[in-house]
C-alpha cells in the first residue's frame, strides 16, 4: 500500500507534510558527516601518534639519562683509578730520583766505612789494597766533590791560617832541579797527584821524569785532615812526558800525557800530532801504558796537548781536558773557520765598532806565535770498559761558545760538570763554563758549553794582553789559575750574584807575583789572604775544597808553584786552610 499523503487526527487538527527531501540532499549530508568523522579520526590518530612519539621520546630520554649516568659513574671510577695511579707514580718518581740515590749513597758510605776498618796483610790479586785500604776517612767521604753552599743566600767568608801538615808533594833536591805542572784529583775514595820533574832547569822540551802518587784523606790528632800517601810511581824511562793531567779512577789513577822533545812552537808548526800516552796505575802496583790515537786526531790536528788540570771519571767514561793547533784545511779547520766567542764585561766594556771587534775576536784564535794555527780546546773521552784497548775520541766544543784553546780542568761537583779554561788569550778574567755531553754509541759525541760571567779579578798578562786589557787581540799570555766553585751557578735572574768560588790568584796585572788566596763572587772579591812576602814569584795554582761532615768544617788545599832560591826555580807547595762561612 502506498503511504498516505495526509495524516488526519481528531480534534479537527490537520498536519500538512513538509517538503519532500530528495536523494541529492541526503547524499551531501552523508558526505559531510563522513568527512567530519574522518577528520575526527585523523586528528585522533595524529594525537595518538604524537602521544606515542612523546612517550617514546620520554622512554629514550630516560635511557640516555641512564646511559649518561652510567658513563659518568665509569668516568668517576677511572678518575679515582688515575688519581691512585698518579699517586703511585709520584711515589715511584720520588723513590727513583730522591730516596733511592740517597739510599745508594748511604749504602756506599756504609760500605766504604766498613772497608776502612778492614786490615789485611795478604797480597790481593785484584786492584785492591795490600795493607791499608784505598778509602778516605769516613768523615770526608760524603763531603768530597759536593757544593759547600746550596742556598743561594749571601754569605761572608774568612780564610784561616795555613795548617801545618806534612807535604805530600816532594820538591827538587838540587839547585838546577825543577818540579812543575802539578795536577791533582780528589775522588770519593782516594786522591791522585802528578807533576813533572825536569832535569835541566825548567826547559820541559829536553828531558824529564814524571812523579805520580795516590793516597787517602785521614784525620790527624789535631782534628784537621792530612793527605796520606800510600803509593808512589816514578816514571823514569827516557820518555819526555809533558803537560800531564791526572784523574782518580776505581782502584787507582789515570794519567794523560803527550811526548815531545821539541819546543811547543815547533809542535804547532808541524803537521803530525805528537805521541799521546794514557797511563793507568792501580793500587796493586799494576802499571799499564798505551799509546792512543783518538778518533778525530789524525788529519785534523797539528798538535794536541793535555790540559794539565785534572780530569774526571764520569758515567763509566774517562774525560780529560785538552787543546792544540788545528790544521787549516782539515775537516775540523774548515768547519770552525768562522767561529768565535766574544764575551763582554758590562761594567768595563771595550769601545769600538762591533764589526771590527768581532773581526779582532776571530783573529785572536790564530796567534802568529803558534804558526797561525787555530788554537782549539777539546776533551779526550775514553770508555772505561774498553780502556785497555784505548777506545777514545776527541769531543770538540764550538768556538762560538769558548775562547781560544788553552790549558784547563774538568770538574765534577754534585754530578754537575764544569770546565775551567786558562785565560791565555785577550780575555783577562777567570773562564768557567758549565758543560754537558751527548754521548753516542756510533758517530761523533758532542759537548755544549755555557759560560759563567765572572768579572771579579784578572790574571797577569804581558804586552797588549795585560790584566787591564778587555779588548780582542791576538796574543798568548796569562797563567793557569783554576777556581773551585763553592755554590752551583744558577741562570735564574737575581741570584747569580751569590755564586761563590775560591782559589789562588796572582795579584798583579803584568807579572806573575803576589800569590793570594781568595774567595770571590761573580763581580767582586769577598776575601783576600796574601801568601808569602810581597813580590814573591809564583806560577800555576790549582784548588780543591771538601768538607768534614763530622763537624761541618770546610777545608781547601791550594797547590801553588812558588819561587825557590834554594832548590830549583819553583817549589810546588800544598797549602791547606780552613774556610769559615757565615
Swiss-Prot record:
Disulfide bonds: 178-202, 192-253, 244-257, 350-471, 382-392, 465-475, 545-556
GO cellular component labels: host cell plasma membrane; membrane; viral envelope; virion membrane
Localization terms from the record: Virion membrane; Host cell membrane
One GO process term, biological-process aspect: symbiont entry into host cell
Transmembrane segments: 35-55
Spans within the Virion surface topological domain: 56-582
Keywords: Disulfide bond, Glycoprotein, Hemagglutinin, Host cell membrane, Host membrane, Host-virus interaction, Hydrolase, Membrane, Signal-anchor, Transmembrane, Transmembrane helix, Viral attachment to host cell, Viral envelope protein, Virion, Virus entry into host cell
MF terms (GO), sorted A to Z: exo-alpha-sialidase activity; host cell surface receptor binding
Glycan attachment positions: 284, 329, 400, 448, 507
Family: Belongs to the paramyxoviruses hemagglutinin-neuraminidase family.
Subunit structure: Homotetramer; composed of disulfide-linked homodimers. Interacts with F protein trimer.
Protein name: Hemagglutinin-neuraminidase
Species name: Mumps orthorubulavirus (MuV)
Gene that produces this protein: HN
